[in-house]
Regions:
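Extracellular/periplasmic periplasmic-binding protein-like sensory domains
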Residues: 243-313, 369-370, 376-384
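Extracytoplasmic "Venus flytrap"
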Residues: 34-55, 77-84, 106-107, 176-185, ...
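Immediate post-signal peptide segment of exported/extracytoplasmic ligand-binding proteins
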Residues: 25-37, 63-72, 165-171
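Segments of small-molecule ligand-sensing domains
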Residues: 296-306, 320-376
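Beta-alpha junction/loop-to-helix N-cap segments that form part of ligand/metal-binding clefts
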Residues: 25-27, 45-52, 64-137, 208-215, ...
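Extracytoplasmic ligand/sensor domains, especially the bilobed periplasmic-binding protein
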Residues: 99-204, 252-278
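Short, low-complexity disordered leader/linker segments with a strong preference
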Residues: 1-32, 63, 381-385
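Sec-exported extracytoplasmic/periplasmic mature domains
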Residues: 55, 59-66, 91-99, 115-123, ...
């Protein structure tokens, strides 16, 4: 009986060792890349496109042999458009999933909130469209593990102010923005700085709180101020509601939205938004992107490509280059390599500065909404720097 028990114990011990070795082998078979963004909430269209684009690109990369001889495992989580949820997700990706890097989230407030988590676990985050200055540098201090592939609010503010004053030749603007949103406040402040420096006047500056659905009071004051254009540094859902209510009040002025407004969802309110403008990182109608848009549509049952898909593409391209440069999946090595590589993305050449972790030499484009044909009309490119 004792011999039998010893034999059973020996067999169990061997199985445990084999199990541990097998688990260790599996752990090293893949490279874990995290993604976080809004799959639900007001920015769901953006987050969904980001995650679907990355899934498509990872599948393509894996089919071609992966990276460093290993397959990529993409782990995605929904932040629900909430900063605290972004923190929770970042902890899960770093502590439990042990990813080597994170792409996203798709909003400045969420990116700013996760800094402490990135610092604690020393895992780099590469943001797609978070434009607030504080994402990578705050109070003059560089954030070691925060990077981005997009232009910044000061640059977007320059593009907006320059477009209104220099291209449209308009001198009176009103502003309507979400007072609790970092992105909106940053863009608003920088637009005012550039537009007024050129000689323009902000005749009305009205605010609302995120979640509001009635903008009658603000729009009435704006109408009375007599602007020639309304600058709305907000997200597409509010952009649509504000347009509809403005038209009901007899306000037929064009509006100018930032990169948070450019979305295929706008065409659900085609008549209301017709003739207004949006700023973007890349032209949504550039023929150079036709094959990429077709690849996405074929993969996702005819779905339309959002801005975030282009930026997710560029972030993934940069991550791949950094991993290859580092020759390792060590998070700190990847963070270092982000500033040592250069790639040609959908939004142009991307080279990350070691000084501020922002891309250098960026430009932005302005496109007009053609509601009747449900498309965009390219207007111009404006240097961001």
């Amino acid at each position: 009986m004792r011999k039998t028990m010893k034999l059973v114990a020996l067999i169990l011990s061997c199985l445990m060792v084999l199990g541990i070795l097998s688990a260790c082998g599996k752990k090293n078979d893949t490279i874990k890349l995290g993604w976080m963004g809004s799959l639900t909430g007001d920015q769901a269209a953006y987050g969904t496109c980001e995650s679907q684009t990355l899934k498509m690109l990872v599948e393509e990369k894996n089919a071609a042999g992966g990276i460093l001889g290993k397959q990529i495992e993409l782990i995605c989580y929904d932040t629900k458009g909430d900063a605290q949820e972004a923190v929770n997700v970042a902890k899960r990706l770093c502590a439990q999933d042990k990813v080597c890097a994170i792409i996203g989230p798709n909003a400045s407030g969420q990116c700013i909130a996760i800094q402490s988590v990135l610092d604690q676990y020393k895992v780099p985050d590469l943001s797609t469209v978070a434009t607030n200055e504080k994402v990578t540098v705050q109070d003059g201090k560089l954030k070691e593990y925060n990077f981005r592939v997009c232009f910044l609010d000061p640059q977007q503010g320059k593009i907006a102010g320059s477009f209104v004053y220099d291209e449209l030749k308009l001198t009176k603007a009103a502003i309507l923005y979400d007072i609790n949103d970092d992105y909106a406040k940053g863009l608003k402040d920088n637009f005012i700085k550039v537009f007024t420096a050129k000689g323009g006047t902000v005749v009305a500056e009205e605010a609302y709180t995120g979640g509001d659905t009635d903008f009658t009071a603000q729009l009435t004051k704006i109408k009375e101020a007599g602007p020639q254009i309304i600058f709305t540094p907000i997200f597409y859902q509010d952009f649509i509601m504000i347009h509809k209510q403005a038209r009901t009040l007899g306000i037929d002025l064009p509006m100018l939205g930032g990169d948070g407004c450019a979305s295929e969802v706008l065409f659900d309110a085609a008549d209301a938004v017709d003739g207004s403008y949006v700023i973007n990182h890349v032209s949504l109608v550039d023929p150079a992107g036709d094959s990429f848009r077709k690849q996405y549509a074929d993969k996702w049952n005819g779905a339309k490509m959002e801005l975030n898909g282009y930026m997710a593409h560029d972030a993934f391209l940069l991550w791949c280059a950094a991993v290859e440069k580092a020759g390792s999946v060590d998070p700190q090595a990847i963070a270092k390599a982000y500033c040592e590589v250069e790639v040609n993305g959908m939004a142009g050449k991307i080279k990350i500065s070691a000084t501020d972790h922002n891309p250098v030499g960026k430009s932005g484009c302005v496109e007009q909404i053609d509601g009747k044909n449900k498309t965009y009309k390219f207007i111009t490119y404006i240097a961001a720097d």
